[in-house]
Regions:
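A domain-start/cap signature at the N-terminus of enzymes
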Residues: 16-30, 34-52, 56-110, 192-222, ...
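Serine-hydrolase catalytic machinery in alpha/beta-hydrolase-like enzymes
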Residues: 80, 84-190, 194, 199-203, ...
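Alpha/beta-hydrolase
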Residues: 112-114, 218, 313
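Sec-dependent signal peptide recognition
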Residues: 1-9
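Short beta-strand/loop motif that positions the catalytic acidic residue
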Residues: 239-241, 245
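Acidic catalytic loop of the alpha/beta-hydrolase fold
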Residues: 245-248, 318-320
Length: 352
C-alpha cells in the first residue's frame, strides 16, 4: 500500500467497541468533549492502516456479478497508477488500484471512492480498507483527488464549493479516461464516498443516475435542495451514518464541533425520506441486519428495483465503519464492515 501524502502523522487505534443498539431514529452527541470544541479535520486522517487484517461482518445481498462485456486493445494491467485528466481547465487526478486478477479482455466492476473534506485520495484508500476488498473480489477502485481537498457537493464543502468547481463533469471526464485505459463493464460502475465525498455521492445519484448503478454515501447527507435533485431513473442507495456524528449531525443542523464552515446540514432522516419517496418504495422499512451497534434497515418494492438501505451506528461518530478509525470525531464501529456491505450492495445493483 502506498503511503498517504499527509503532513501530520497520528497514531490511530482500531475502531471502537460496540454498544447496545438503539432502534430509533433519534441521535444526539454523547461525548461532552465535542461540545464547543474545534478540530482541524486534516489532523484526523490516516497515514497508515494500523490493523490491515481487520474484518467485520456485513449483511448479505443477492449478488449479480456475471458479465459478458468484453474489450480489446486495453493497454494497462494490474497494479497502481495515477489516472490524469483535464477537466474544466484544471489538471485532475485519481489514484487507481487494480487487482492482480484483472483481465484486460473482460469487463471489470469499477468503484469510485471520494475522500472527505481536508482528506486525500490516499487517506480514503487507507481508511476504507478497500484495496484489500478489491484484491479479494476483483473489482477496480479509483480514488479521485478533490481541488483543495474538497468537493462541490451542492451546498458543501470548502474551496470546490465556493469556487464552483464542476466535480460532476470531472467525474464524467475521469470515467472516460479510465474506460479508455481499462476494460470496465459500463453496467457495473458505482460511487461511494466519506463525509464531503458522501455528499458528492448523493449529488452524483441526482445527476449521474444514467452512469452509476448505485451510490453508497458514508457520513454524508444530501447537499442540495431536494427540488433540484432529479435523477433520470430511480437509483439504489446504501447509506451509513453514526447517531452521534459530531461533524455531520444525524438530525441535521450545525456541527457539534467547529470545522470552520458555517453550514447547516440536512438531517439523515430527511435525506432518506427523499430517496425513499423519489424511488417510489412501497414496502415499509424492515431490519435486515443487526449486530452490536450496527442496524441496517431496508425500504424495498421500489421502482426499478432501486432499494434504499440505511445502516445506522448507535453512538457512532464521523467514521467509516469497519475501517481505520479517525481520532477526535467519535466512535468507529467494528460491528459491521461498510466496505464489504457496500461492495455486496453494488454487486446486487448493476445499471439496468
Amino acid at each position: 500500500m502506498r503511503a498517504a501524502a499527509l503532513t501530520i502523522a497520528l497514531f490511530l487505534a482500531g475502531c471502537g467497541t460496540s454498544s447496545a443498539v438503539d432502534a430509533g431514529w433519534e441521535g444526539t452527541p454523547t461525548d461532552a468533549s465535542f461540545e464547543g470544541g474545534s478540530v482541524n479535520l486534516a489532523d484526523a486522517y490516516p497515514t497508515a492502516d494500523p490493523n490491515p487484517d481487520a474484518s467485520a461482518p456485513s449483511p448479505d445481498f443477492d449478488a449479480s456479478t456475471s458479465t459478458t462485456f468484453t474489450c480489446t486493445g486495453k493497454t494497462l494491467g494490474s497494479g497502481s497508477h495515477d489516472e490524469n485528466v483535464s477537466s474544466g481547465g484544471l489538471a485532475r487526478v485519481a489514484h487507481m488500484h487494480v487487482p492482480s486478477s484483472y483481465d484486460a479482455t473482460k469487463g471489470a466492476m469499477l468503484v469510485v471512492a471520494y475522500h472527505g473534506f481536508s482528506e486525500s485520495g490516499y487517506a480514503q484508500e487507507i481508511q476504507s480498507r478497500m484495496d484489500k476488498s478489491s484484491d479479494a473480489k476483483g473489482y477496480i477502485v479509483a480514488y479521485p483527488e478533490g481541488i483543495a481537498t474538497s468537493w462541490n457537493a451542492g451546498d458543501c464543502c470548502g474551496d470546490s464549493w465556493t469556487g464552483g468547481v464542476d466535480d460532476v463533469q470531472f467525474t464524467r471526464d475521469l470515467l472516460g479516461a479510465i474506460e479508455a485505459d481499462y476494460c470496465i463493464d459500463p453496467k457495473r460502475v458505482f460511487a461511494t464516498g466519506f463525509s464531503n465525498g458522501g455528499f458528492l455521492s448523493h449529488r452524483l445519484g441526482c445527476e449521474m443516475s444514467d452512469v452509476f448503478g448505485a451510490i453508497a454515501p458514508v457520513a454524508g447527507v444530501l447537499g442540495e435542495a431536494p427540488s433540484s435533485c432529479k435523477p433520470k431513473r430511480p437509483i439504489p442507495v446504501l447509506d451509513f451514518h453514526g447517531l452521534s456524528d459530531p461533524v455531520v449531525p444525524y438530525n441535521g443542523g450545525t456541527p457539534f464541533i467547529n470545522i470552520g464552515m458555517g453550514i447547516v446540514f440536512r438531517s439523515v432522516p430527511d435525506t432518506l425520506s427523499f430517496w425513499v419517496n423519489e424511488n417510489g418504495c412501497l414496502a415499509p422499512p424492515v431490519t435486515i441486519f443487526q449486530n452490536g451497534d450496527a442496524t441496517c434497515t431496508e425500504w424495498s418494492l421500489c421502482k426499478g428495483g432501486a432499494d434504499v438501505v440505511h445502516c445506522k451506528i448507535d453512538q457512532g461518530g464521523h467514521q467509516w465503519p469497519g475501517g481505520v478509525a479517525l481520532p477526535i470525531v467519535g466512535k468507529c464501529s467494528t460491528d459491521i464492515s461498510a466496505t464489504d456491505t457496500i461492495i455486496d450492495f453494488f454487486e446486487a445493483h448493476p445499471l439496468p
